[in-house]
UniProtKB/Swiss-Prot annotation:
Function: Component of the cytosolic iron-sulfur (Fe/S) protein assembly (CIA) machinery. Required for maturation of extramitochondrial Fe-S proteins. The Nubp1-Nubp2 heterotetramer forms a Fe-S scaffold complex, mediating the de novo assembly of an Fe-S cluster and its transfer to target apoproteins.
Species for this entry: Drosophila ananassae
Amino-acid positions noted as binding [4Fe-4S] cluster 2 in the UniProt annotation, renumbered to this chain: 239, 242
Protein name per UniProt: Cytosolic Fe-S cluster assembly factor Nubp1 homolog
Compartmental location: Cytoplasm
Keywords: 4Fe-4S, ATP-binding, Cytoplasm, Iron, Iron-sulfur, Metal-binding, Nucleotide-binding
Cofactor(s) listed in the protein's UniProt record: [4Fe-4S] cluster
Cellular component per GO, a single term: cytosol
Length: 310
């Protein structure tokens, strides 16, 4: 098949070959054939590229602004520190809002091409990162792409990056259950090793966030993706002056704990709003040297995550 038009709905869409964007496309007849069997050749390429990646972990949230990208970077730092003999990769598939280069202290780094594909950027001895943020001319450049182009970029990241031997690949996803989620799940699901792809879901305590997180949990259940558990972020705020704790986002309906009990998924732990952590993330500093209740909670959460893959 020839290259699709820019606004192609995608060969897996029910609208394939039927919408105005398909007019004049040489593949329109193929796509609109109700008897066609759609097999994305990219899936085989992804499987070959990731054959040495033991496990994959999707970091998800139905709601934007809950700190999913921040939690991804914190988990990466702590997993790498607690498992120094293991190798970790981070793939930032939040195409329109890539945050990992800043959070992991890699702003301004360049991606290099080798005979094996793109080389991800090294963060630590046992951590590497790939993000579209490395491919932009400026950190302020806007990415205005429709679904098929985003999906094509995700396929390239999965099939054309030289990830090498990884014990765990963490994928920072955009909020919701959009094209990016469907695309990455279709490429990563392996029926022969269903337990190699799992999910962690991030929320905040208030009902407006939990409402969408429930949808994300149901998305995982429908896609048969095992859920390691839920992390409640910004659960409280401890004042650095008086030491008192406050609920910035009151859990009027019981917070993540009540939701997890209702939906029968584990609660991995809770993380407070922490000015020290926020400052370190903004500057891309390693937060593993900070010792407080937040980092203690992170240690416990990371232990549960690694245990789920053993």
């Amino acid at each position: 098949m020839e290259a699709p038009p820019e606004h192609c709905p995608g060969v897996e869409s029910e609208q394939a070959g039927k919408v105005s964007a398909c007019a004049g496309c040489p593949n329109q007849g193929i796509c609109s054939d109700p008897n066609r069997k759609v097999e994305d050749p990219g899936k085989a390429l992804v499987a070959e590229s990731l054959k040495d990646v033991k496990n994959k972990l999707l970091i998800l949230s139905g709601k934007g602004g809950v700190g999913k990208s921040t939690v991804t970077s914190l988990l990466t730092r702590y997993l790498a520190r607690s498992c120094p003999n293991s190798n970790f990769g981070v793939l930032d598939i939040d195409i329109c809002g890539p945050s990992q280069p800043r959070l992991l202290g890699a702003l301004g780094e360049n991606v290099h091409q080798s005979g094996s594909g793109w080389s991800p950027v090294g963060i630590d001895d046992n951590v590497c990162l790939m993000s579209i943020g490395f491919l932009l001319g400026s950190v302020d450049d806007a990415i205005i792409w429709r679904g098929p182009k985003k999906n094509g970029m995700i396929r390239q990241f999965l099939s054309e990056v030289d990830w090498g031997n990884l014990d765990l690949l963490l994928l920072d996803t955009p909020p919701g259950t959009s094209d990016e989620h469907l695309s990455v799940v279709s490429y990563l699901k392996d029926d022969t090793q269903p337990e190699s792809l799992r999910a962690v879901i991030v929320t905040t305590p208030q009902e407006v966030a939990l409402l969408d997180v429930r949808k994300e949990i149901n998305f995982c259940k429908k896609q048969n993706i095992p859920i390691v558990g839920v992390i409640e972020n910004m659960s409280s705020f401890r004042c650095g002056n008086c030491g008192n704790s406050s609920e910035i986002f009151p859990a009027k309906t019981g917070g993540a704990a009540a939701m997890c009990a209702e939906m029968e998924v584990p609660l991995l732990g809770s993380l407070p709003l922490d000015p020290q952590i926020a400052k370190a993330c903004d500057s891309g500093d390693d937060i593993t040297e900070i010792k407080n209740s937040t980092t203690e909670a992170l240690d416990g959460i990371c232990s549960k995550i690694m245990s789920s893959f053993s």
